[in-house]
């Protein structure tokens, strides 16, 4: 009964169209309020109006969109079940014989009422890249060098609305494809990449990309690998996606922002790109191999502090780039207190000055850490309208859209059917550690035949169910009676043994 009341309240609050009502809505970036002592100090963002930050303003006639990944093939009734905060039914692609590319497993579940809809999105595609044919500038008969395909998986964890996550799930792989078009022939050529490409198509007499600028003619020259070209293409694609969101955020209602975790399989290698707090791990013969790391105010403290130090105008008169063990009080002026700045991993003492009474740029610990008392992730896409509560200070300058990309060479190992790459949004990792995921991998896959492609969907479902928990009087609980995840949870399980059946 309590869950039904919570769901009804969340529905009523989230459906409001005015900005004043949205500022109290639960579907906003996680925020913390300054301590009570802030009332005695220069104004800080959390002391102006309420504890939450306002979501991007909407007009009353703005429709609230709700969609799920197309590969789930949900009927209208299925969409309603997927949107039910009370039942929280796990969703997976139907077992109709047409499975996801590479026999990928997928499962998701909606949150327990923190936002009106599931703000996670997912994408799984096989993408063909055709050469621009402007590299060599000569016409050739069709050949295998004219293009290649890559496998693509993406998880997008939205916040302050699902618009950014939905847009990224539809378009990011297209940006990656565009960035790879110039590299089709280069990546299939065993010679080192050329230093320069021709500025205009139609370079006569050139039959190979390696002949455009001979590496031997430039000495010394940095060695550039094919891997680094793919990494650069993915990084550029993220930036272009973010720029597109900035341009179209009004006309296309690109609300909020999203963390992005993407995997590209190309020419024998997995490229895992992460911007946000979603994570990926490989479980190989019982061994756990992290393939990403979280980007939070804690993990990126020094980058944030350096930017605040170099551009103090971004902090206004409200924030300090320095970090203290706790909020500095006016009575402590002139005393020496522990602090650290952008260059420090340890702590030292400094004399407290008036500027130190400002609210810290990075505050809180663990999952409660925030940038400018507002948002708990430091990389991702979107958030172009995000500002400090009751302030004109934008937060976007401190948020990076560039991912960290890690490369895993599948050809270097013999993989068995139980070796998998697990991708999960933070709804999974908030309550499940790497060892528990690995144990679930072993437990679930051992009950299926190695050639049964449904085993990976079953594993994804088990991981989601394990993080969600079961409903009890005091909410969703794990078997140890600890709180289950109340967040949206999305999981991909990718077998490392090779491509499976794909959609026709």
UniProtKB/Swiss-Prot annotation:
Annotated SUPFAM superfamilies: PP2C-like
Keyword match Ribosomal protein: no
Residue ranges, annotated region (Disordered): 1-102, 194-217
Pfam families: PP2C
Keywords annotated in UniProt: Hydrolase, Phosphoprotein, Protein phosphatase
One GO MF term: [pyruvate dehydrogenase (acetyl-transferring)]-phosphatase activity
Chain positions found as Phosphoserine: 65, 75
UniProt EC number: 3.1.3.16
GO biological process: signal transduction
Gene Ontology CC terms, in alphabetical order: mitochondrion
Chain positions with Phosphothreonine modification: 41
PROSITE patterns reported for this sequence: PPM_2 (PS51746)
Highest taxon, organism lineage: Eukaryota
Recorded catalytic activity of this chain's protein: O-phospho-L-seryl-[protein] + H2O = L-seryl-[protein] + phosphate; O-phospho-L-threonyl-[protein] + H2O = L-threonyl-[protein] + phosphate
Coiled-coil blocks: none
Family: Belongs to the PP2C family.
Subunit relationships: Interacts with UBE2I/UBC9.
Protein name: Protein phosphatase 1J
Organism: Rattus norvegicus
